[in-house]
């Protein structure tokens, strides 16, 4: 009798466990899925620019942006110029904003780059971002840069940049800097 009671209890326990899994699966299926238009959670802020993002930026645009960093590292200002639009808005890490023609921007950057004997960039990562409602493409980068000046001074910093790309060219560039030392 004890064996039968034990077996019945064990069977009921196993069935009860399986039933909960079924209930959990059906409860999960009844929950509405989050959509791009409706956030899954009640957030304390509403994005003023956009909260609708995808990674729908071409690999060619990504390569072009990363090549501009390689051109800076190698001192290839003419190569860097090819990745920039006719007019570029630049938000510098100093807080200054400049709007310059491609030629004037290259003059500014040539002066800076010519003061250095070497530049080394350790590209930590990047993200392709496409604002689906604004229809704008961005490549965001995170990297460390080590600059050796011709005076012998060595400077290093961590950077976070935002590159807005339109028609295969960078039209807006914002740079944020944190010195390493």
Language-model features: locations:
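C-terminal motif of bacterial Sec signal peptides marking the signal peptidase cleavage site
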Residues: 13-16
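Short beta-strand edge/turn micro-motifs at domain boundaries
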Residues: 21-22, 156-181
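A short hydrophobic beta-strand element
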Residues: 135-145
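Positively charged n-region of N-terminal signal peptides that target proteins for export
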Residues: 1-4
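Short, low-complexity N-terminal intrinsically disordered segments enriched in polar/charged residues
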Residues: 18-74
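Short, cysteine-centered beta-strand-loop-beta hairpins and adjacent loop/turn segments enriched
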Residues: 96-97, 146-156
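Hydrophobic pocket/interface hotspot
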Residues: 68, 79-81, 88, 105, ...
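A solvent-exposed, acidic/Ser-Thr-rich amphipathic alpha-helical stretch
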Residues: 77-129
């Amino acid at each position: 009798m004890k064996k039968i009671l034990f077996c019945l209890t064990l069977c009921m326990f196993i069935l009860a466990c399986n039933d909960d899994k079924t209930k959990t699966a059906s409860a999960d299926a009844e929950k509405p899925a989050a959509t791009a238009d409706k956030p899954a959670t009640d957030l304390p802020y509403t994005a003023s620019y956009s909260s609708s993002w995808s990674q729908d930026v071409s690999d060619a645009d990504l390569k072009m942006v990363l090549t501009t960093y390689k051109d800076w590292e190698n001192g290839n200002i003419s190569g860097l110029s090819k990745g920039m639009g006719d007019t570029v808005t630049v938000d510098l890490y100093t807080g200054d904003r400049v709007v310059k023609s491609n030629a004037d921007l290259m003059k500014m950057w040539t002066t800076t780059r010519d003061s250095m004997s070497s530049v080394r960039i350790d590209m930590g990562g990047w993200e392709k971002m496409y604002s689906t409602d604004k229809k704008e493409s961005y490549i965001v980068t995170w990297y460390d840069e080590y600059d050796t000046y011709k005076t012998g001074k060595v400077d290093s910093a961590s950077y976070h940049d935002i590159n807005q790309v339109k028609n295969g060219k960078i039209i807006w560039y914002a740079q944020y800097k944190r010195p390493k030392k």
